[in-house]
Amino acid sequence: MRIKLEKELAKVHFKAKFLWDNGATEEQMKPTLALIRKSQWRWDMVHSSHGAAFHAPIESERLLSDGLIYALEAEKNLDVLKEKLHIAAEFVMPDISTKAKAQKEIGLDIPKEEAAKKEFLKTIVPKWIEQAKKEGRLVTQK
């Protein structure tokens, strides 16, 4: 159920962007965004409560099922709005089958992010370590 919901959530997020890019207004999108949010919350609740699938499997499945229903309802709303706006272009789900493809699709510049992390580790972390040493708060240093 979790995988079904994750695929549907990804689709409705991209489909919502497609409609934004084709002229949908905030007022038109408001009910659909509420459904997407409800769906996302349910996925997040189950996914972030690490032991839920073991300790409360029926409740976890119920939450994921509810999330899927909200996501499918959101997709239906998006399809109706697309027709209402007379958008001729077809929505094409991007290929996000790998982490690299997904990162590229959302515009994440990995080399830039890696460079920023390297700079952070080189400049900021040593200052934190030095300050912790001065204040006697450094328990261990690797």
Residue ranges and their predicted role:
Residues 1-114, 118-120, 124-127, 132:
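Primarily the internal scaffold of c-type cytochrome electron-transfer domains
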